[in-house]
From Swiss-Prot:
Complex and partners: Homodimer. The tRNA molecule binds across the dimer.
HAMAP family attached to this UniProt entry: Ser_tRNA_synth_type1
Protein's name in the database: Serine--tRNA ligase
Location within or outside the cell: Cytoplasm
Catalytic activity: tRNA(Ser) + L-serine + ATP = L-seryl-tRNA(Ser) + AMP + diphosphate + H(+); tRNA(Sec) + L-serine + ATP = L-seryl-tRNA(Sec) + AMP + diphosphate + H(+)
GO CC annotation terms, alphabetical: cytoplasm
Record remark: domains: Consists of two distinct domains, a catalytic core and a N-terminal extension that is involved in tRNA binding.
Its job: Catalyzes the attachment of serine to tRNA(Ser). Is also able to aminoacylate tRNA(Sec) with serine, to form the misacylated tRNA L-seryl-tRNA(Sec), which will be further converted into selenocysteinyl-tRNA(Sec).
CDD domains: SerRS_core
Binding locations of ATP: 262-264, 349-352
Family statement drawn from the similarity comment of this UniProt entry: Belongs to the class-II aminoacyl-tRNA synthetase family. Type-1 seryl-tRNA synthetase subfamily.
Organism of provenance: Mycoplasma mobile (strain ATCC 43663 / 163K / NCTC 11711)
Entry's Gene Ontology BP terms: selenocysteine biosynthetic process; seryl-tRNA aminoacylation
Any Pfam family the entry gives: Seryl_tRNA_N
Amino acid sequence: MLDIKLILKNKDFVISKLKQRSNFNVSEIEKLYTLGTERANILISLSELQSKRNEISSKIGEAKRNKTDALFFMDEVENIKKELSILEEKSTKIENKIQELISFIPNIPLDDVPFGKDDTDNVILKEFPKIGRGLVKAKKPHYEIGVEKDLIDFSRGAKLSGSRFIVYKNAGAKLIRALESFMLDTHEKNGYSEIMPPFLVNSKMMYGTGQLPKFKEDLFKIEGHDLYLIPTAEVPVTNLFNNEIIDLEKNSKFSSFTNCFRSEAGSAGRDTKGIIRLHQFNKVELVEFASEQKSLRAFNSVLKNAKYLLELLEIPYREVLLCTGDLGFSSRKTIDLELWLPSEQRYREVSSVSYFGDFQSRRSMIRYRDENKNTQYVHTINGSGLAIDRVLAAILEQYQNDDGSISVPKVLIPYLNVEKI
């Protein structure tokens, strides 16, 4: 979340930056400014009353030592206590209202994020169309060849759980496992520590990374419990250090494979065929913690490692810088990696690498000690490394051969022990 002090000191700056986001009501900042100013004035009054109470209390002590009447001073202290109680209650109510409002305020885009209304205004930074077989045309879409080769069972997935659920079978299941292992092994070689977290977390953790309260409808909640299925490993891995002071020398780079669960509210009718948009999907996530000074270096590190996987898999891709109108709620800057999907003859997102500044760490109280031993909020960065189901879809289409077989990417052969499917 934003620092209320920033809003109080630079209200016009905050408004001008958040105006660049789509559908943001800047009147919320005005409300926060009014509440913050009112609370600041109350805190001044509280401080003055506390000083006055202490001063009078010393007079009471002096009167008792001199064996003179202290009743007047004692009555005055009681009156001050009543005033303090009223002001403290008022301050608490205002603070609660501030926290409620500020929980819905998105992050401030960095200056190098382009202005735009939606994804049509995103900026293509680089394209790598000649990797592997290049921008080929698929002989068959992944959902057809996946069924023909008995790799994916859509009908039984729907029977078990409903639409947007699938069953991987035989070499399909093995490919998912191979991709998971390949990605985690590669990240480990590049300095990431592997985490296997719970797939269920409580609402405090969802709040910490920015999913709650704003995106409640996108989540699967366990009825009767304060537990949610994770939409991404970002949630549990970031919150490993919720309300902690961490050592950035020991805890800074993590990778995690998890199943992810999203209700896809608002996505009705989109990507209804295939494995591009599922309620349950597989993903490896990269999370880095850094000081402010090293945060953009960490952002580039996550981006580099996600790109490296696509290069090893020899899948054409491009880098896309998201504009202000398409930027995620918690993000200050995001670069998407999009792989080539032959059946659609277009690029599809396979990783979003995002820099959050201290937005998440303020919500989740993750801090570190700087060189002067002062506590500071860490800066957080994460990105998919990679979305496995979408990578599988690209492989099934990109690596089709004339004889109907599917070649296995070279880097996956050691995991599958076959060259073709």
